[in-house]
Amino acid sequence: MIYKKYGRTGKEISVIGFGGMRFPKEGESYDYDKCAEFVVKANDLGVNYFDTAPGYNDDHSEFIMANAFKKMSKPFYVSTKSNDRDGAKLREQLETSLRRMNLEKINFFHIWCILDMDDYKSRMVKGGAYETALKAKEEGLIEHIVFSTHCTGDEIETIVNDDCFEGMTVGYNILNFPFRQKGLQAAYKKGLGVATMNPLGGGIIPQKADYFDFIRGEDDETVVDAALKFNASHKEITTVLAGMGSMEEVLYNCRVGDNLESLDADKLKDIEGRLFNSMDKLCTGCRYCEYCPKKIPVSKYMLSYNNHILGDTQGIFNNLKWHWGIKPEVVKECIECGLCERKCTQHLPIISRLKEIDEFSLTYK
């Protein structure tokens, strides 16, 4: 397993991290012992970063992790989260997570799912989430305060420049990399560790392997290899979180972490060029369309619409709700001025896609 330094923390983190929200159900419940076997095996194979959160797997993930931690023989680090804005509620959630996982401290505690700058400011108010986490750190209950976000690259840059955090977790993959690249670079420049989630686009990339076959290089056996390598080869990225819901997935993902050959800057630029040239129907997140006179966040709608093109219409509304906290009815504000379409580098039919999203919202939620 390859290891990278997590920012300035001094910790060496496995390039593949264990994402703890893909455990399989056995009927209507989770077999804690069976799921824990995946976690233990990953640790045996060198994974030392384990990411979980309240609510993952119907709120069972932290319990599964606890089952695994007591059986693991190699050192490991734990990442969990709270999305509470209220300081007292965050403290309660932190103590619950510690108790559930039988831990004295959380290594990486996330101010979780910052949606936009207004949301960020709400976490930073006096007596709020961040200040409470800082006090818990002083007490030794938290080792490193980090954040997770679905913000734009510009917004991420603003957050990291406030110098309040030691690391971040951010969605980053071949579908959205232009949307977040600036934030990634800003975090690296500031010395933050970076974990990336959704490296496989929430499963879309392997499900549509034929569509994305163009990203494979000469040494890549599969599209999944190429997608994981794309993330892990960025110097700015410390660890790539991969959900592992079977022993086969554990073995596969760890093999990628064992055999990773870093891509140099020229090769990464080549891949990025192929992505832009090949995804002619998909929004690449360049954000040239952002100057809507009605303040519609067009790029976020178009990135969400990518899910429909790839066969997952429900994914539009999952993204809007959980990634950005946007209501689908905002598209009704469109006055069809065409400014966004004139700015679009992909020449996408943005207006008609906004109308489709409005129509889909009658069926999907």
Sequence positions of predicted segments:
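N-terminal binding-site loop/beta-alpha segment at the start of enzyme catalytic domains
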Residues: 1-76
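Conserved residues at the C-terminal ends of beta-strands
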Residues: 19, 53, 109-112, 148, ...
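Short catalytic-loop micro-motif centered on adjacent basic/acidic residues
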Residues: 49-55, 79-80, 143-147, 167-171, ...
